[in-house]
């Protein structure tokens, strides 16, 4: 993280002294994103839920990281669920792209890894979608809440999981535990 901050300061100095007047907008957007990420990653690390762990495969690339969530209550207790988070160049005007890497039986997470969480949507009917005022902390806390208070059986992405819960809660719990045993340890 400190390496990236130093690199940004160096690049800013080079740009100020030697960049011609029509500088590349994409490079400027990346720079804005990276500046935001330096601040947001520090805030995230200071306010990370106890059930979450963030890792950066490349500490110089804050735009790509992994999140591990180990719920401490509910159906998913005992599991460790991995998510990949990619922050696009147009951040914070668009939300990060998130995928669940762990196979899971969950009404709001498809077995293919897609996630139904309103704050990850660019546009949402209920007004709770992405806004430039949201941060990585909101994303991580939202993902963490999918295992507790945001677990939503009424508006599912995985309809089979939601219907399974409606039909037989105990069998649903057993299937969740089978998935944890087989994929989430």
Curated annotation (Swiss-Prot):
EC number, as in UniProt: 2.3.2.34
Highest taxon above the source species: Eukaryota
Pathways per UniProt: Protein modification; protein neddylation
Annotated UBC core domain residues: 32-185
Enzyme active site: 116
Keywords: ATP-binding, Nucleotide-binding, Transferase, Ubl conjugation pathway
Location of the region described as Interaction with uba3 in the Swiss-Prot/TrEMBL record: 1-29
InterPro entries: Ub_conjugating_enzyme, UBQ-conjugat_E2_core, UBQ-conjugating_AS, UBQ-conjugating_enzyme/RWD
Catalytic activity: [E1 NEDD8-activating enzyme]-S-[NEDD8 protein]-yl-L-cysteine + [E2 NEDD8-conjugating enzyme]-L-cysteine = [E1 NEDD8-activating enzyme]-L-cysteine + [E2 NEDD8-conjugating enzyme]-S-[NEDD8-protein]-yl-L-cysteine
Alphabetical list of SUPFAM superfamilies matching this protein: UBC-like
GO MF terms, alphabetically ordered: ATP binding; NEDD8 conjugating enzyme activity; NEDD8 ligase activity; NEDD8 transferase activity
Cellular compartments per GO CC: cytosol; nucleus
GO biological process: protein neddylation
Function summary: Accepts the ubiquitin-like protein NEDD8 from the UBA3-NAE1 E1 complex and catalyzes its covalent attachment to other proteins. Together with the E3 ubiquitin ligase rnf7/rbx2, specifically neddylates cullin-5 (cul5). Does not neddylate cul1, cul2, cul3, cul4a or cul4b.
Family affiliation: Belongs to the ubiquitin-conjugating enzyme family. UBE2F subfamily.
This protein's name: NEDD8-conjugating enzyme UBE2F
Organism: Danio rerio
Gene that this sequence comes from: ube2f
